[in-house]
Amino acid sequence: MDINQLIEIVKRKINQNISCDTVEVEDKTFLHRSHPSHQNGKFHIKLKIKSLYLKEKNKIESSKKIYKILDEELKKYIHSIQILID
């Protein structure tokens, strides 16, 4: 899977499962290429979500919801994820 496919899947799954105004996904893998733990095919992403639904939850609850939605992608394709809720 390439990063563009992953971004589309992440956006689609978030939008299908959470009421959101916007979902933005940024590839931050380039910042970690020189790290010893870097693996080809594993990506670092930054996820920015504008959602009243998530904003009303605390940080742990909103993160758990996102982790559950992206469970398969986290196991196979995402090495790290930064989540920003607005």
Language-model segment annotations:
Residues 1-86:
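N-terminal, polar/charged subdomain of small-to-medium soluble alpha/beta proteins
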